[in-house]
Amino acid sequence: MKILVRYHDGAVPLTILPQRDWIDLCAAETVTMHAGEFRIISLGVSMQLPEGYEAHIVPRSSTFRKWGILQANSMGVIDESYCGDDDVWGFPALAMRDTTIARGDRICQFRVMRKMDKPELVTVERLDNASRGGFGSTGTR
């Protein structure tokens, strides 16, 4: 699979580590944030994904512990149409404490996945399955 990558100012070159199918993304700028502040941190790259694929962006497991930031959209999804020269990838960060993220800090990671086939949605009156409870009910009696 070939992915075309354009690096912008401050970008750290991507590396693929052996035996990993997630690729780390680094902050392309140094950012100081205060508790409660939201900011999109530039990752400094634009990419052209292969047709029929999308990228999933999530925080690294240490991101919250090291910098106290959460990814505000839970998981970022970038489809192959977001492929222009200036379609720079970003990390939507919500700071839970005062923090500084330095240029080059590995704050998130991505992987490329094949998009699902277009589903056929069928409206029915009943699903004829047992109801299991509402959200948050798993594990309760």
Language model regions located:
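DUTPase catalytic domain/fold
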Residues: M1-R141
